[in-house]
Regions:
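Alpha-helical adaptor scaffolds
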Residues: 208-216, 247-251, 375-385, 401-447
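Residue-level detector of the short coil/turn that links helix A to helix B
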Residues: 43, 126, 184, 218-219, ...
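Short coil/linker segments at helix-helix boundaries
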Residues: 39, 43-47, 66-230
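Generic helix N-cap/helix-start motif at coil->alpha-helix transitions
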Residues: 25-32, 59, 104, 152, ...
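"A position-specific structural signal for the A-helix of alpha-solenoid helical repeats
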Residues: 34, 65, 69-72, 110, ...
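Alpha-helical repeat scaffolds
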Residues: 47-54, 83-98, 130-143, 181-195, ...
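Solenoid-like repeat scaffolds
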Residues: 26, 53-60, 101-102, 148, ...
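Terminal, low-structured helical/coil segments at or just beyond the last alpha-helical repeat
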Residues: 231, 357-372, 380-384, 468-469, ...
Length: 496
């Protein structure tokens, strides 16, 4: 009798817990897959793939990590042939994941992650419509998972990111997002990313995304910079963190710190090649006026990069090296060939390529005045945070020395940004205000960017009325080459 009872008890236990056993079998973070994920997050793709090859191909976590590896390879190389060869894997992996245990909180997260991997890759290859549908479907999967498993932290890494993106949508388009079933705001997304930062699996990635949101959507503060430095120092063997740390610092006018991250980045055969690093190093040399060094870096980038993005931008910067490095007419002639190349190579998917193409088209048709060299040197130095050099270039000049309205607007904008970077907002305001006034009639990009910076200045002064007015003014500018990034930042500031 006791034996019978024991058997019934065992059978009952198995029936009760069988769904959890199946779930565990479908989505298992084995020690090997944990090591592989850690390696992938460091851009050590080959060692991760070797580790994954020892794991079951039926494991949903293995499928996710295989996809993660493909995403990293495609995103860092921009290789069109590789994209054509690998793109069918998205639907194959989704089909397999859909058949796995849908009572597991991991199933919808893994489906969403695969879709978001390919959305990111497709955007880089100019497939915007397909990428958009992947994002929409990923959002719905994550929203459903949140309802079913509200305390499951891995959901919130990507859901929080999407809520930030939705919160950046302009007011006159929010109805489209709502019609598609997309809801969320920036504060909600940031809170979710903060929560996901505590997750043992996705925590590191969530923290990195939060830094990128602060840098590319919001306003990156000195406090953010200190937290970023500490975060990167805690992971000295992580190439991905060093790379993104460098791009964030460069974006925010701290090129010396960006250079420090790249100089201290981990290297070796285990790490994925990043040709774009040569481009960043070239940028920093160009900002410093070290033209031979910049040329070497840009040429190395072109020799190793297989994609179509950043080509226009790189040839434009090679033009700048020769144009700014030789004030004689011979320098103008020698540099012209690089601008002609800008027109014929690459594509205009990214903003830097759009700006390069616009400059090349204008210069080749109309030429450039000597004053534009001065403004360009000041711009490059200021963008890198080398404000002493930037002021040295512009101090001998005043607005009156620039005959053309676009030059007058740019002079004022550059002076305003220099003082803003030197934490002298009171000195910056008159210059930025003048740049805005000069830019409005012709809708010059300097007006939009000046309005954005004035919004930030008044926000810092806690003058919300003026800040809001300037953010709205920034959005009102039409058809300039930086509209996407300016509008996103202005909308984000308005929605905070």
């Amino acid at each position: 009798m006791l034996t019978f009872i024991r058997r019934v008890a065992v059978a009952t236990t198995l029936l009760v817990f069988l769904p959890f056993v199946v779930s565990a079998q479908d989505f298992v973070w084995t020690p090997g897959l944990q090591r592989a994920f850690s390696d992938l997050q460091k851009l050590k793709v080959a060692p991760a793939q070797q580790q994954m090859a020892r794991e079951s191909t039926a494991n949903g976590i293995r499928i996710f990590l295989d996809d993660y590896a493909d995403m990293l390879l495609l995103a860092t190389s921009d290789d069109e042939q590789a994209f054509d060869r690998l793109s069918d894997r998205e639907s194959d992996r989704l089909d397999v994941l859909k058949k796995l245990d849908d009572t597991s909180p991991w199933q919808r997260v893994m489906l969403a992650e695969v879709r978001l991997h390919w959305a990111f890759v497709k955007l880089k290859f100019g497939k915007e419509v397909s990428a958009s549908w992947d994002v929409i479907r990923a959002y719905k999967l994550l929203a459903e998972n949140q309802k079913r498993f509200p305390n499951f932290l891995p959901t919130y890494k990507s859901l929080g990111t999407l809520h930030v993106m939705i919160g950046s949508v302009p007011d006159n388009y929010i109805w489209v997002a709502n019609l598609l079933g997309l809801h969320g705001n920036i504060k909600q997304g940031q809170d979710e990313l903060k929560g996901a930062g505590q997750d043992p699996v996705f925590g590191r990635e969530a923290r990195l995304i939060d830094f990128m949101v602060r840098a590319y959507v919001l306003k990156f503060t000195d406090a953010d910079e200190k937290l970023l430095q500490r975060f990167i120092s805690e992971h000295p063997d992580n190439l991905l963190l060093n790379f993104f740390g460098a791009t964030i610092e460069q974006k925010n006018g701290h090129s010396e710190q960006a250079l420090a991250y790249l100089a201290n980045r981990p290297t070796g055969k285990d790490y994925l090649a990043l040709p774009i690093i040569e481009n960043i190093l070239g940028d920093i040399s160009l900002q410093k006026g070290e033209y031979p060094s910049a040329i070497t870096h840009f040429q190395q980038f072109l020799a190793t990069y297989k994609g179509q993005n950043f080509l226009k931008d790189t040839y434009y910067k090679l033009f700048l090296c020769y144009w700014l490095g030789d004030d004689r007419s011979a320098g103008d002639i020698a540099s012209r060939a690089y601008l002609q190349k800008v027109i014929t190579v690459g594509r205009t998917t990214v903003e830097s390529d759009k700006a390069a193409h616009k400059f090349a088209d204008t210069y080749l048709k109309r030429g450039a005045s000597p004053n534009q060299k001065v403004l360009m040197r000041a711009r490059l130095a200021s963008d890198g945070g080398f404000t002493d050099s930037a002021l040295t270039y512009l101090r001998p000049y005043s607005e009156a020395k620039f005959p053309l309205t676009p030059e007058k607007a740019e002079y004022n904008y550059r002076m305003g940004r220099i003082f803003q970077r030197r934490n002298d907002s009171d000195a910056a305001i008159p210059y930025l205000s003048r740049a805005l006034t000069l830019s409005e009639p012709d809708q010059l990009s300097f007006g939009a960017t000046a309005a954005l910076q004035l919004g930030y200045i008044y926000k810092q002064k806690n003058d919300r009325t003026h800040a809001r007015s300037f953010f709205q003014k920034a959005i009102s500018f039409k058809r300039h080459e930086y509209k996407n990034s300016v509008d996103n930042k202005a909308r984000a500031a308005l929605n905070e």
